[in-house]
């Protein structure tokens, strides 16, 4: 059985983002105007960044769960350019992460527990099915990888 651990993260996240877009995951009206954290200077360049972030959060919860908003904020943070002063690490936007988690909960892919958010059995099978599709695509491109 193919799992999330068996395929490259970038291809899995891209494919998951496409599937989430097909599932009509909710998109807040402010996504076109916000930065993804204090450490960023501009908004994301990609128009579908919301779906990519939701897919990335879903993958992180699958791998590291149970996980809370604070840990995810740290994962999506970065160094802030402060001019002449030394750079410091700043956490990512908590509002973006909270809203993404709420949308994933509405779809039934993630649920709240006292320890943090975890992937539901539906979410686990959703990601495993996508991982199988990604693995099949990779094997079609490079047949030598079929033995792995």
UniProtKB/Swiss-Prot annotation:
Gene3D superfamilies: Winged helix-like DNA-binding domain superfamily/Winged helix DNA-binding domain. HAMAP family: Ribosomal_eS19. Disulfide bonds: none annotated. InterPro entries: Ribosomal_eS19 (IPR001266), Ribosomal_eS19_archaeal (IPR027548), Ribosomal_eS19_CS (IPR018277), WH-like_DNA-bd_sf (IPR036388), WH_DNA-bd_sf (IPR036390). May be involved in maturation of the 30S ribosomal subunit. The keyword Ribosomal protein applies. The lineage of its organism: Archaea, Methanobacteriati, Methanobacteriota, Methanomada group, Methanococci. Keywords: Ribonucleoprotein, Ribosomal protein. It comes from the Archaea. Transmembrane segments: none annotated. GO terms for molecular function: RNA binding; structural constituent of ribosome. GO terms for cellular component: cytosolic small ribosomal subunit. GO terms for biological process: ribosomal small subunit assembly; translation. Part of the 30S ribosomal subunit. The keyword Lyase does not apply. Belongs to the eukaryotic ribosomal protein eS19 family. This is Small ribosomal subunit protein eS19.
């Amino acid at each position: 059985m193919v799992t999330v651990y068996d395929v490259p993260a970038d291809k899995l996240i891209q494919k998951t983002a496409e599937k989430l877009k097909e599932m009509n995951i909710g998109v807040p009206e402010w996504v076109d105007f916000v930065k993804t954290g204090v450490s960023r200077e501009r908004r994301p360049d990609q128009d579908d960044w919301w779906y990519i972030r939701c897919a990335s959060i879903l993958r992180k919860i699958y791998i590291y769960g149970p996980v809370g908003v604070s840990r995810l904020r740290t994962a999506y943070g970065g160094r802030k350019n402060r001019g002449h002063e030394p750079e410091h690490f700043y956490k990512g936007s908590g509002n973006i992460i909270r809203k993404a988690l709420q949308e994933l909960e509405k779809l039934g892919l993630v649920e709240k527990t006292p320890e943090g958010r975890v992937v539901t059995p539906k979410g686990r099978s959703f990601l495993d099915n996508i991982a199988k599709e990604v693995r099949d695509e990779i094997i079609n491109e490079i047949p030598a990888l079929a033995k792995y």
